[in-house]
């Protein structure tokens, strides 16, 4: 029986037109191969098992590339497909699918224990489908995509590809903060719709790169905001999933297999994905994002985030410590803590000393009262900076109201918390700030800047600004320009106002500033920023900065490296052999070239007012750099 089955199988494999008993040649996979392989596997010796995977149950697996009339077809053990996938792809010329399944199941029941104990299928073979993904918008979306990849990996989708034509699932993680961001997404969805149509043509000629037409999945803020419009858009999208429903993605994708649209955009009061270890998009990166809280309670008039991301909720401290520990073990040297309003972090699952009060920045207020006070953002930073003394920490995006003195003094005293504060102003006029529902005045904002610089003298301050908000006059716009000049920001994100549906502004205000006026004011704002940011960079010339090396400088990849200081300034330098201060303390005075992930002390020699250039002095560590007097004598003696 074994020789007969193998003979039949060999005949099929040698036939360039496939199996005459099964699906139409050149367009489909051959189901007969699966049935015959189960019989051959059961009865043959180990020589036959080298060709085909073992049958494990009624869902026998065998993978192969699409049939090509000119080249025949070949077995490909890197992919897999199920009986239901094959059955839905074509018509029979011979025995029915029911007959094949019945015979295969009957034979599988006779499988010996020895066969059942064979090694499991390769992880790639067991993959349910290949994933292609694109992400638009903020860092939170990047981190969310890593959470999605982890969920999909645990559900059997183990392979990520860089070509959308090779994918069975296409994820588009979207941003709804501005109209331009949404327009880019619609353009991409049109392209993916074209790929779905093209797949049918390619499959008919054996040229399809994926096993099935791709399922297009919209994630993120647009999913919640425009779910009905997206699903009605001429079958462009198969699944719409909001930021709090990513655990439901495997089920939603299965619904598509049954001809249904998959949709879940419910917002949650509890979901933080605290138990999920994200699959890093850049596996070898020495920097990473870690989400510590989700949602926002501030309800600013212009902002769609509370409506697409929901209310604030924070991860437990211990889950964050665990994730950062995993990153440290994998070689990550810098972590950016993320949240829509990151410094309003409140782990109310933890105990807090009685009598503690929720403090805001002086002169700032909030529209949302805190019901249960737990561990705050300063408590989280305190734990992280102590437990990981050689890891650098940043955080974004905060609200100016949540900078109590406790947080500022902690940033001053901990060497591994970056001297960088993001302080979104949005406007420099008090009336517009009130219209925006920001909870502070121009004067309160400037007082906070003054306090920050008195506590952390060498701090870098960055900001966000909106031009052309509803009812903004020329005089009010000029006050924004004067605020930029007064503060002197190291960096700023600046945009023309874009009205968003559902927001307070959409319900109550008129978008009455003409688009050309918005753009002109934006240009003036950018010019004012450039006038003041140059001195921030120029002031670094002559100083020694600790630079975390991120890779070769693209302008001179063979000779220069580039990295960032704790203030976020880009610094490039010529690579050369350097002493490693940590090794010097152990008596090793050999020099080596710095590499990605090294902290390098660099003396700044030149400023381009957008980046810095300097001379590398030594490879170091954060703890050594901030106590350099201890090892300077050792370095000098070795150099002599």
UniProtKB/Swiss-Prot annotation:
All copies of domain Radical SAM core, residue ranges: 282-535
Entry note: cofactor: Binds 2 [4Fe-4S] clusters. One cluster is coordinated with 3 cysteines and an exchangeable S-adenosyl-L-methionine.
Amino acids binding [4Fe-4S] cluster 1: 138, 175, 221
Keyword Metal-binding belongs to the record: yes
Cofactor(s) demanded: [4Fe-4S] cluster
Domain MTTase N-terminal intervals: 129-258
Keywords: 4Fe-4S, Iron, Iron-sulfur, Metal-binding, S-adenosyl-L-methionine
Domain TRAM: 538-618
Keyword Magnesium recorded: no
Binding site for [4Fe-4S] cluster 2: 296, 300, 303
Pfam family, one: TRAM
GO biological process: regulation of cyclin-dependent protein serine/threonine kinase activity; tRNA modification
Family membership noted in the UniProt record: Belongs to the methylthiotransferase family. MiaB subfamily.
Function field: Potential regulator of CDK5 activity.
Family matches, as NCBIfam families: miaB-methiolase, MiaB/RimO family radical SAM methylthiotransferase
Protein name per Swiss-Prot or TrEMBL: CDK5RAP1-like protein
Organism: Arabidopsis thaliana
